[in-house]
Amino acid sequence: MSLSNKLTLDKLDVKGKRVVMRVDFNVPMKNNQITNNQRIKAAVPSIKFCLDNGAKSVVLMSHLGRPDGVPMPDKYSLEPVAAELKSLLGKDVLFLKDCVGPEVENACANPAAGTVILLENLRFHVEEEGKGKDASGNKIKAEPAKIDAFRASLSKLGDVYVNDAFGTAHRAHSSMVGVNLPQKAGGFLMKKELNYFAKALESPERPFLAILGGAKVADKIQLINNMLDKVNEMIIGGGMAFTFLKVLNNMEIGTSLYDEEGAKIVKDLMAKAEKNGVKITLPVDFVTADKFDENAKTGQATVASGIPAGWMGLDCGTESSKKYAEAVARAKQIVWNGPVGVFEWEAFARGTKSLMDEVVKATSRGCITIIGGGDTATCCAKWNTEDKVSHVSTGGGASLELLEGKVLPGVDALSNV
């Protein structure tokens, strides 16, 4: 799925116009401090383009976290983002305490030329996602008439609409598909992301290696299935590997992750790999733990020895890392989605760290390396490799759905050209 038939910001006339722009400022926070500003930085080129080309105003809207339609300004306010954005843009940013309603509409109706406005968290309104919880935590659905009113209010905040929220492009939420303006364009981040994935999937450099980690096979079935039609090699690591190893090798896996649902189709996936000539690499050894805890007792295990009862595998071992390194060394293009161990904890980070080192090495010899957002992007931030790979996606779920071969609603909703 590419933007080839969609309107993009570089083709949009913004002079004298109010631009309402959906961005993805869903950044990690600790004690109201932003811990990784990658997503904010990623939106700056689109914002600057509008200002440099004479836009009257740029009104930015985003979600943060999962307040589920309940206003939680103490926990999920976008106000800290306004300060960060001010320092990145080098100009004042007006923060509004809501995202819809008469006061917001007034503030956005006729601002001074060149004004940048940031709205409060869209998800403080249940109408953004269409469902959520009430103040007591009971599940609720938004009323259709109220969804329409919410969308109509957002539509009043600009003359043209730009969507640069690649990280949310897989969600058919009000701010993504419900703004009713004559011109709806994809921003530069959206364009960059979609172009990278389109090229990677439609005309890949070969050998093409997919590294798939993470926990559940069931969550990644469509991903594995779709990628088996595209790649030459695949590493299946992380917690997901135990389901494969138990089914294929009858390995004793102790209390390691096991996915009942996913187990049923392991053999089908392996048969497809064989039919397509895809070489699959699974881990052969493990770092084990006596409980799921940062300070657990640790041990070693292999596929042959099995993992003892009451213990679990939380990282791959050195032999697995060697096998992974060989696969990486053969590749001319790599897409990596999901870590191969519990990298957040030092004792179980070595497998993912050594794989990252190999991917960085591959990049420096000209291999195209694409990191598919989410946890794997967090690994890049943690080990400072964001500029040492070809592309770090800003969207975990969105990149996953592209790799699964799905149409993204947020892209679908843009104006055709």
Swiss-Prot record:
Residues modified to N-acetylserine: 2
Region listing for Mitochondrial targeting region exposed following cis-trans isomerization by PIN1 and recognized by the TOM complex for mitochondrial translocation of the protein, in residue ranges: 38-43
Positions of modified residues (Phosphotyrosine): 76, 196
Sequence positions that bind (2R)-3-phosphoglycerate: 23-26, 38-39, 62-63, 65-66, 122-123, 170-171
Broad class of where this protein is predominantly found: cytoplasm
Cellular component per GO, a single term: cytosol
Positions of post-translational N6-malonyllysine modification: 131
Binding site residues for Mg(2+): 215, 218-219, 375
Binding site for AMP: 215-216, 220, 239, 313, 344
Enzyme class: transferase
Residues recorded as bearing N6-acetyllysine in the entry: 11, 48, 75, 86, 91, 97, 131, 146, 199, 267, 291, 361
Catalytic function, reaction form: (2R)-3-phosphoglycerate + ATP = (2R)-3-phospho-glyceroyl phosphate + ADP; L-seryl-[protein] + ATP = O-phospho-L-seryl-[protein] + ADP + H(+)
InterPro entries in the record: Phosphoglycerate_kinase (IPR001576), Phosphoglycerate_kinase_CS (IPR015911), Phosphoglycerate_kinase_N (IPR015824), Phosphoglycerate_kinase_sf (IPR036043)
N6-(2-hydroxyisobutyryl)lysine: modified positions: 97, 216, 220, 323
PROSITE patterns according to UniProt: PGLYCERATE_KINASE
N6-succinyllysine sites (modified residues): 6, 48, 191
Pathway membership, UniProt: Carbohydrate degradation; glycolysis; pyruvate from D-glyceraldehyde 3-phosphate: step 2/5
BP term (GO), one: gluconeogenesis
Sequence positions that bind CDP: 214, 219, 238, 338, 340, 343
Cofactor: Mg(2+)
Intrachain disulfide bonds: none
Subunit: Monomer. Interacts with kinase MAPK1/ERK2; the interaction is direct, occurs under hypoxic conditions, and promotes its interaction with PIN1. Interacts with peptidyl-prolyl cis-trans isomerase PIN1; the interaction is direct, occurs under hypoxic conditions, and targets the protein to the mitochondrion by promoting interactions with the TOM complex. Interacts with mitochondrial circRNA mcPGK1 (via its 2nd stem-loop); the interaction is direct and targets the protein to the mitochondrion by promoting interactions with the TOM complex.
Name of the protein: Phosphoglycerate kinase 1
Organism: Cricetulus griseus (Chinese hamster)
Gene: PGK1
